[in-house]
């Protein structure tokens, strides 16, 4: 799900662009060698300028990194009285388009906002279908926002969680996403203490960054198959972090309530990253807490659920480790991409966690 290619870096000019391209080419060549996708010499073929060969070989690497089946963008089924509208937000850090789902049930009073960050190669429409979050919004009367990554800022539509310029408050993509969220809050008069963010893969990694950078804005985080904030500072360290090697972690002063889902068969983002998100979420938390572990089954898959409570008995962190699940949204809808219909319903459990009375 999280893929990188030569064109994924933000476009620059002159020497800066050339330097980035050379660095990316070198990284790709070394990565291709690691995955057995190079010639016998251990380097990409050098006929011509090598760019076509590099793109072709990189496509093979992307195929290795992605689950079977490409992304799908089936049409969303919108109930009468509901709205699924596209808009755009612009600030000094840049512009992003987004879709907002306002359920028909909102006329009875809006309960909150869930910001959903898609994974690489996905679209807001696809992610909405795959997670089934709009149906839950109808049931619980909350608004859903689906920001869309620009292909001009990442060629594979990945959120740039591995870029230093996109990991801090009021800079880069966090600034854009926070501003976008505030705009929706004001437009729909959403309760300020019921704003949450969730994501899949690269989207989950960015959701974790947002939870740490804006604890005053996002009151809980849902991370599915993601990585901790600060896990990488560039593409090289991103690959290491995804493989479960040498992952960094940004210190956190304010704990953010977090629910984590990860498959123990995830070959794209190593499951150790889920545990790292949990540790990071608990940093700066209360001195005393209780933890419970339970082994259960749902939807044809076994899973281990670890719950950490704060000193007041409120759920602070949940960690769902799902047996046999790969790099896909647990309990998702088959019509969407990167979903697995088996296992516990990640969307429903995130909504329960977000809107629990103790939140």
Model-found features: residue ranges?
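Cap/lid segment of the alpha/beta-hydrolase catalytic domain
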Residues: 148-172
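Conserved alpha/beta-hydrolase "acid-adjacent" motif
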Residues: 268-273, 330
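Short substrate-entry loop that stabilizes the transition state in hydrolases
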Residues: 106-155, 230-231
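Alpha/beta-hydrolase active-site loop
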Residues: 165-188, 209
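Primarily recognizes the serine-hydrolase "nucleophile elbow" in alpha/beta-hydrolase
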Residues: 185-187, 192-254, 267
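A domain-start/cap signature at the N-terminus of enzymes
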Residues: 1-113, 125-126, 131, 198, ...
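Short beta-strand/loop motif that positions the catalytic acidic residue
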Residues: 260-262, 266
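The conserved beta1-alpha1 loop
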Residues: 115-121, 225, 262, 323
């Amino acid at each position: 799900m999280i893929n990188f290619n030569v064109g994924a870096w933000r476009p620059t000019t002159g020497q800066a662009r050339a330097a980035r391209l050379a660095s990316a080419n070198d990284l790709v060549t070394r990565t291709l060698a690691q995955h057995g996708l190079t010639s016998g010499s251990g380097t990409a073929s050098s006929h011509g300028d090598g760019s076509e060969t590099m793109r072709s070989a990189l496509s093979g690497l992307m195929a290795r990194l992605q689950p079977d089946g490409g992304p799908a963008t089936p049409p969303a089924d919108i109930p009468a009285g509901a709205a699924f509208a596209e808009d755009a937000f612009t600030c000094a850090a840049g512009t992003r388009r987004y879709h907002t789902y306002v359920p028909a049930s909102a006329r009875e009073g809006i309960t909150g906002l869930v910001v959903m960050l898609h994974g690489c190669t996905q679209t807001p429409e696809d992610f909405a279908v795959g997670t089934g979050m709009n149906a839950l919004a109808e049931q619980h009367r909350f608004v859903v926002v689906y920001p869309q990554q620009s292909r001009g800022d990442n060629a594979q539509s990945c959120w740039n969680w591995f870029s230093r310029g996109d990991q801090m408050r009021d800079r880069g993509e966090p600034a854009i996403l926070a501003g976008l969220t505030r705009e929706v809050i004001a437009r729909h008069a959403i309760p300020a203490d019921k704003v949450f963010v969730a994501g899949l893969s690269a989207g989950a990694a960015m959701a974790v960054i947002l939870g740490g950078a804006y604890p005053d804005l996002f009151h809980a985080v849902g991370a599915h198959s993601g990585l901790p904030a600060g896990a990488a500072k560039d593409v090289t360290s991103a690959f290491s972090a995804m493989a479960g090697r040498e992952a960094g972690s940004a210190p956190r002063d304010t704990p953010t309530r977090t629910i984590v889902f990860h498959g123990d068969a995830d070959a794209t983002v190593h499951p150790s990253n889920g545990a790292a998100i949990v540790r990071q979420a608990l940093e700066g938390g209360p001195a005393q807490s209780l933890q419970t572990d339970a082994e259960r089954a749902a939807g044809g898959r076994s899973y281990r659920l670890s719950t950490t409570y704060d000193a007041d008995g409120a759920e602070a962190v949940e960690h769902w480790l799902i047996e046999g699940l790969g790099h896909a949204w647990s309990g998702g809808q088959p019509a969407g991409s990167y979903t697995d219909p088996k296992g516990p319903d990640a969307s429903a459990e995130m909504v329960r966690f977000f809107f629990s009375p103790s939140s």
